Each structure stands twice: as C-alpha cells, then as structure tokens.
C-alpha cells in the first residue's frame, strides 16, 4: 500500500485555462516540494497551456 509520505506520489495536472484534469504523473517530493507546473497540450483548448498540480 502507498503511504501518505510516499517519495514519488501520483499527481494530477489540470489546465490553468479550462480547469480540465488532463494528465496523471508522478513527481519526486524531495526535488519538487511545491506544486508542479508544466506546459502541456490541452485537448479541450486545442493548444499548449500551463498545467498545474491539483490536490
């Protein structure tokens, strides 16, 4: 079972513009303690937008 203090937890990335949750990925908590933000393609908007980690 995954504990709440997992080093590489699963996170969901949501589009900043339309708020759709498009991507699921893992991140390293030691390297990225704050929220992750990546520029990825949003199929709902039809272009590359900033995607941010949701809780």
Swiss-Prot record:
GO terms for biological process: translation. The keyword NADP does not apply. It comes from the Bacteria. One of its GO terms (molecular function) is structural constituent of ribosome. PROSITE patterns: RIBOSOMAL_L33. InterPro entries: Ribosomal_bL33 (IPR001705), Ribosomal_bL33_CS (IPR018264), Ribosomal_bL33_sf (IPR038584), Ribosomal_zn-bd (IPR011332). It holds the Pfam family Ribosomal_L33. The keyword ATP-binding does not apply. GO terms for cellular component: cytoplasm; ribonucleoprotein complex; ribosome. Keywords: Ribonucleoprotein, Ribosomal protein. Belongs to the bacterial ribosomal protein bL33 family. This is Large ribosomal subunit protein bL33A. It comes from Mycobacterium tuberculosis (strain ATCC 25177 / H37Ra).
